């Protein structure tokens, strides 16, 4: 197969992916005793498209899958998509709104039908993009968290947990999105710092002329206050504890209580306690057994009658609220109440105050802590009949503590344990239509029945008219079951037996609690074993300035645009469409034009993957730099061109395939073979320990520097001057080292390595399989490491570097050839044929003593070197003097800039660092120029 003159990724990527899939390489065998390797894809939202985080995550997962496949393991990478309850419902509702229709106009069943229609049309975007990234997943195992198989597992888990007393319905404080009309998880809440105010309000002490002044950022919740708290160690207010206060605007009285939650140094030292509208206050109220007074409706407007509850969820009546505020939004109620407080002389002060405002990540509306009826999983209770005597949380804590589940890097264990040891019961219900409908029904009296089907439930309530609960389950509930539901549970399948636990989960740190911990809980509880052995936590991909990539910032990069390239107008359109804050569009356009004046060039999948791998150090966030992607695109070109050179020099010739023919290896051949063994061992260790950054660096250094820049160049000398046995050994080494390097690189750059391997492998006598994907992973043979050859190569490199430095000092252009004289051991004569080529020499000789000439001398190991070139001393002195003068001037200017008062403190850190590096380079250059001038003198 003849290689094209240049590497064009688009010409090979789709072709090879289709071939791999058609050949069945992505599928495991269910009839084998080989060790198994399984990995679960964190299921992306069905609404989503591939972003840089996905590309990063999937590069690591595919790299591991390809690595273990080549090692001979029975590999399975399970793909899937999450139904993404809230996100999907919003998308479809927006489409309906454009037609002037709401979901309520359609009704539940028709609306859900519309969602399924949308999913069938649009839901495959991310899977087609995964193919572009080269993901070798078993597409036959692809699941959707709402498909029949997954839904059966979800229902089964819910029913079993309910029967074990671990699922219950209760009234609790939850994050409530009033615009969506549903509870949301903490992950769907973004707290943003905003300019607000702190109001100081008087609360008169009953039976006294004293008042206490309470500082609050939310005066509209005052109607639901049940107490005012002080710190028990605050001497100023200890005498007030137990006293009653008049609650402004209500006619009620509330007590002063002491609680450690209060920071005596913040505000006035008094804190209003409103447990029905604040999570911290809820905990304070629970400790003091106060009432819960709910003053808001589900649309975040004020009620006419407050609802009063106990912490056990029991209704305790109602309280009339001022009619003037009934039906007002929280913002309007705040204005009205502040005016009334001011008129009553109870508003003391208003101060500017920066505060964190929780907003829904999809709606932007303020999230209200609200008391609502929800379904919960009991996290710290032992299930009925559980022989382990442990809660689902404790089982998950033990799994990590015992080492059955290992975090990489291990510092994330502390984060995991901190969350687990402070866990609250999990709110699993959502007031949506799209999702797994809760398998619970109610009779006319409101009694709940839970079962797998209506028929099963009806048998428990004969003669009763049953109404199904309209809520759906939190998306994270079904995601938590993926390690076993995706493999056929509750049925006992061969896949469950073979692939649980999986070897590793690859994910970001932001979902350790929401997903990782819950998978460990559910799998240990239902299967009695862990879902995975390792959890590899990687950082977040940020933009080049370290900012989080987000649509609102306009700095999102589509990985496919890096693969295929994109013109500037299309890129601007992409970045400014659908902004939550359209007013930011001009700013985004300006930034995009500055960063990508010509758009984004096409880098190809392999360069993108290698870039991602190079960033995959343990747990660190990634500032994505396009220059690195460009560098690795050049690396692909280097690998391609080196292979073309090798093929042109070996094709049709004897490459040492006939083992009976003599082979005469030079020290250069032995050196590259030695380095290859060390590379095989080091890359294997790097991948075994998830150090993709090290693996990519090792491969890059070996291929670019050692193989291409040194060995291939030296092989030219051997092919030109060697005898038949030497040439045969060189050709054999060229192709065999390249073939192994391609296999080592394949997990990171699958497409280019496959294309090149198909050409190289037959000549290396290594084409034992039809694809590099299933070729054997290289195993180092340390007996092939030749220490003597490596030592000689080190000396030779010193010699060549010294020659190059001499050429630089003497200002010799690339076309100028000069004779080299070496004063040193006779063994240096072996190096000279190679040095002639690499040092651009007209001749080279080992002599007893260097000639007496006006030429600089260099030291390399045991040798002294001289390039004998007639130099015009006067002209060279003038040139060096001029260069020294310019360098001194540049050093002086840069030093003055860095010493300028305030520059280092006020200028951007990147700019200061660049200036310091430039100064160091200039200082070094100046020292070298002065040394050259001194030698001439």
Curated annotation (Swiss-Prot):
Q: One MF term in GO for this entry?
A: ATP binding
**Cellular component GO terms, alphabetically?**
cytosol
Give the residues annotated as coiled coil.
874-937
Q: Which Gene3D superfamilies match?
A: HUPs, Isoleucyl-tRNA Synthetase, Domain 1, Valyl-tRNA synthetase, C-terminal domain, Valyl/Leucyl/Isoleucyl-tRNA synthetase, editing domain
Q: What stretch of residues is annotated with the motif 'HIGH' region? A: 44-54
Q: Which domain of life is it from?
A: Bacteria
Reported EC number(s) for this entry are 6.1.1.9
InterPro entries linked: aa-tRNA-synth_I_CS, aa-tRNA-synth_Ia, Anticodon_Ia_Val, M/V/L/I-tRNA-synth_anticd-bd, Rossmann-like_a/b/a_fold, tRNA-bd_arm, tRNAsynth_Ia_anticodon-bd, Val-tRNA_synth_C_sf
Q: Which residues does the record give as ATP binding sites?
A: 551
**Which protein family is it in?**
Belongs to the class-I aminoacyl-tRNA synthetase family. ValS type 1 subfamily.
What is its quaternary makeup?
Monomer.
Purpose: Catalyzes the attachment of valine to tRNA(Val). As ValRS can inadvertently accommodate and process structurally similar amino acids such as threonine, to avoid such errors, it has a 'posttransfer' editing activity that hydrolyzes mischarged Thr-tRNA(Val) in a tRNA-dependent manner.
Q: What is this protein called?
A: Valine--tRNA ligase
Query: Gene encoding this chain?
Result: valS
């Amino acid at each position: 197969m003849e290689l094209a003159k240049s590497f064009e990724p688009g010409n090979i990527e789709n072709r090879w992916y289709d071939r791999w899939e058609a050949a069945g390489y992505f599928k495991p065998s269910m009839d084998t005793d080989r060790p198994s390797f399984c990995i679960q894809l964190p299921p992306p939202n069905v609404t989503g498209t591939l972003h840089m985080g996905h590309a990063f995550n999937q590069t690591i997962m595919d790299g591991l899958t390809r690595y273990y496949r080549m090692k001979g393991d029975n590999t399975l990478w399970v793909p899937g998509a999450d139904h993404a309850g809230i996100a999907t419902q919003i998308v479809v509702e927006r489409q309906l709104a454009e037609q002037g229709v709401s979901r309520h106009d359609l009704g539940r069943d028709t609306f859900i039908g519309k969602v399924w229609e949308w999913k069938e049309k649009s839901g495959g975007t991310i899977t087609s993009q995964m193919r572009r990234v080269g993901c070798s997943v078993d597409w036959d195992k692809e699941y959707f968290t709402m498909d029949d198989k997954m839904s059966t597992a979800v229902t089964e888990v819910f029913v079993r947990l309910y029967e074990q007393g671990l699922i219950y319905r209760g009234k609790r404080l939850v994050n409530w999105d009033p615009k969506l009309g549903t509870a949301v998880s903490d992950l769907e809440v973004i707290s943003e710092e905003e300019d607000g105010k702190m109001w100081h309000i008087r609360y008169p002490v009953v039976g006294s002329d004293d008042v206490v002044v309470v500082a609050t950022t939310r005066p509209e919740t005052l109607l639901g206050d049940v107490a005012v708290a002080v710190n028990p160690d605050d001497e100023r207010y200890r005498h007030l504890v137990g006293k009653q206060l008049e609650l402004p605007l209500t006619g009620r009285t509330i007590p002063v209580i002491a609680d450690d939650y209060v920071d005596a140094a913040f505000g006035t030292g008094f804190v209003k306690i409103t447990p029905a509208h604040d999570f911290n206050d809820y905990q304070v109220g629970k400790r003091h057994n106060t009432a819960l007074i709910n003053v808001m409706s589900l649309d975040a407007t004020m009620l006419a009658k407050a609802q009063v509850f106990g912490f056990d969820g029991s209704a305790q009546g109602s309280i009339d609220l001022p009619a003037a505020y009934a039906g007002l939004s929280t913002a309007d109620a705040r204005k009205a109440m502040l005016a009334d407080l001011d008129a009553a002389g109870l508003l003391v002060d208003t101060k500017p105050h920066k505060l964190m405002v929780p907003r829904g990540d999809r709606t932007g509306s303020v999230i209200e802590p609200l008391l609502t009826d929800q379904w919960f999983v009991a996290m710290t209770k032992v299930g009925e009949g559980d022989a382990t005597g442990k809660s689902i949380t404790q089982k998950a804590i033990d799994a990590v503590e015992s080492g059955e589940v290992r975090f990489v890097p291990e510092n994330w264990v502390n984060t995991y344990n901190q969350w687990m040891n402070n866990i609250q019961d999990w709110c699993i219900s959502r007031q949506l239509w799209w999702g797994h409908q809760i398998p619970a029904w109610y009779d006319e009296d409101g009694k709940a029945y839970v079962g797998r089907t209506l028929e099963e439930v009806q048998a428990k309530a004969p003669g009763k008219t049953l109404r199904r609960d309209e809520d759906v389950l939190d998306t994270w509930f079904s995601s938590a079951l993926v390690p076993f539901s995706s493999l056929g549970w509750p049925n006992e399948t061969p896949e469950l037996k073979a692939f649980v636990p999986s070897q590793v989960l690859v994910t970001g740190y932001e979902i350790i609690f929401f997903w990782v911990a819950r998978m460990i809980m559910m799998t240990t509880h239902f299967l009695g074993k862990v879902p995975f052995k390792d959890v590899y936590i990687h950082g977040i991909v940020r933009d080049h300035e370290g900012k989080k990539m987000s649509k609102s910032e306009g700095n999102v990069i589509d990985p496919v645009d890096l693969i295929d390239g994109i013109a500037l107008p299309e890129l601007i359109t992409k970045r400014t469409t659908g902004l939550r804050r359209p007013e930011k569009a001009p700013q985004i356009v300006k930034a995009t034009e500055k960063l990508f004046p010509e758009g984004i060039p096409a880098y190809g999948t392999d360069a993108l993957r290698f870039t991602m791998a190079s960033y995959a150090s343990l747990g660190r966030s990634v500032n994505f730099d396009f220059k690195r992607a460009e560098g690795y695109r050049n690396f692909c070109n280097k690998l391609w061109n080196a292979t073309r050179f090798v093929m042109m020099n070996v094709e049709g010739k004897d490459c040492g395939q006939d083992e009976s023919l003599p082979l005469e290896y030079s020290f250069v051949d032995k050196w590259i073979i030695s380095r290859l063994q060390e590379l095989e061992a080091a890359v294997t260790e790097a991948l075994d320990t998830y150090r993709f950054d090290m693996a990519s660096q090792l491969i890059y250094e070996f291929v670019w520097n050692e193989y291409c820049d040194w060995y291939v160049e030296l092989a030219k000398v051997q092919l030109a001057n060697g005898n038949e046995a030497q040439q045969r050994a060189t050709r054999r080494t060229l192709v065999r080292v390249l073939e192994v390097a391609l296999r080592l690189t394949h997990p990171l750059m699958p497409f280019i390595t496959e294309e090149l391997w198909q050409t190289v492998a037959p000549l290396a006598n290594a084409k034992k399989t039809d694809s590099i994907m299933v070729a054997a992973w290289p195993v180092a043979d340390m007996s092939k490491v030749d220490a003597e050859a490596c030592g000689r190569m080190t000396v030779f490199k010193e010699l060549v570097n010294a020659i190059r430095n001499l050429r630089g000092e003497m200002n010799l252009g690339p076309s100028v050839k000069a004779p080299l004289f070496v004063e040193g051991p006779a063994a240096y004569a072996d190096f000279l044929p190679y040095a002639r080529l690499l040092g651009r020499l007209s001749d080279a000789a080992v002599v007893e003593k260097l000639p007496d000439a006006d030429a600089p001398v260099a030291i390399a190991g045991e040798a002294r070197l001289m390039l004998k070139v007639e130099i015009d001393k006067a002209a060279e002195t003038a040139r060096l003097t001029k260069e020294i003068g310019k360098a001194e001037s540049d050093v002086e200017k840069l030093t003055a800039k860095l010493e300028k008062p305030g520059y280092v403190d006020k200028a951007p850190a990147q700019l200061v660092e660049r200036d310091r590096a430039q100064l160091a380079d200039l200082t070094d250059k100046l020292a070298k120029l002065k040394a050259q001038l001194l030698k001439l003198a």
